[in-house]
Amino acid sequence: MKFNEFLNHLSNYEPGKDIELIAKEYGVKEVIKLASNENPFGTPSKAIECLRQNANKAHLYPDDSMVELKSALAQKYKIQNENIIIGAGSDQVIEFAIHSKLNSKNAFLQAGVTFAMYEIYAKQCGAKCYKTQSITHNLDEFKKLYETHKDEIKLIFLCLPNNPLGECLDASEVIEFIKGVHKDCLVVIDAAYNEFASFKDSKKHLEPCELIKEFENVLYLGTFSKLYGLGGLRIGYGIANANIISAFYKLRAPFNVSNLALKAAVVAMDDDEFTKKTLENNFSQMQLYKEFAKKYDIKIIDSYTNFITYFFDEKNSTDLSEKLLKKGIIIRNLKSYGLNAIRITIGTSYENERFFTEFDKILR
């Protein structure tokens, strides 16, 4: 059977390995997953109780207006319901953005190394990709590439903070950059990890209500997968002016998010105790990873996320990843990004100590 030609130029996204599969493959009793930037404390207890109470409604289609969650988000961000679209993860909203703006005759712009799904989705449309020479977000390079190819570029991705590297630009820098972008070019700010950045440094905080008030061409993305511990329910959102949201709705299938996910997201948003514990743990445990890197002279980029990336010169990241797997520790090897590096999710104190103990043995 023949398939569309563009599929020959696509590669699969590589997700973090599954705990049960690793336990079976390597014969390890206890497996710790520090690969997919999931919340180390799991799902909030209030959200779990909500899921229990609504499990008997799993046979029902959700409220397609999603008014309850939209209203909660609108109140949080001081915006209107018409400024919000809910997706099966923020990934789906990325897909809406790409399919609404890109085709084989135009292009998009991104950092040298960033979230892989931007390019995967864009290649489905045949769009050309311009990347900065720097692997991190260098706005001077973004400006130069945009000015050179502005007639082609119809979409710009800013992953703030950046996955898989962790760096983050100051909000003021981002706003100044957007001022130089034509209003017909959509600027996507992927803020999946922005709560972690804002907790660490208020200068990194981006306020979506201010962004969409000042710019008609900005899309702000948020997710419930990281801070709120709902990764398995696949739910995220986009915030933009009403015209953008209206266009996206033409691409959205009905009932794209389950009723259980919608209910749990509303409850999780209101669990301040859980999010506070998550942010405080992440900040304190991140310091230990920095100290470990310093001990072994491992290169890092200052991370504003819930993960840290270790770069290596002589040691091979694939070998290191395999040795950790044999010890029952799953991390993310970044060879697929062209980097000799590993990305480690900040876990609980117990999980992190396990990592330090085993990685210490490997590096000696």
UniProtKB/Swiss-Prot annotation:
First-level EC class: transferase
InterPro entries: Aminotransferase_I/II_large, HisP_aminotrans, HistidinolP_aminotransfase, PyrdxlP-dep_Trfase, PyrdxlP-dep_Trfase_major, PyrdxlP-dep_Trfase_small
N6-(pyridoxal phosphate)lysine sites (modified residues): 226
EC number(s) reported in the record: 2.6.1.9
Cofactor(s) annotated in UniProt: pyridoxal 5'-phosphate
The entry's keywords: Amino-acid biosynthesis, Aminotransferase, Histidine biosynthesis, Pyridoxal phosphate, Transferase
Domain of life: Bacteria
Record note on quaternary structure: Homodimer.
NCBIfam families: hisC
Family, per entry: Belongs to the class-II pyridoxal-phosphate-dependent aminotransferase family. Histidinol-phosphate aminotransferase subfamily.
Entry protein name: Histidinol-phosphate aminotransferase
Gene field: hisC
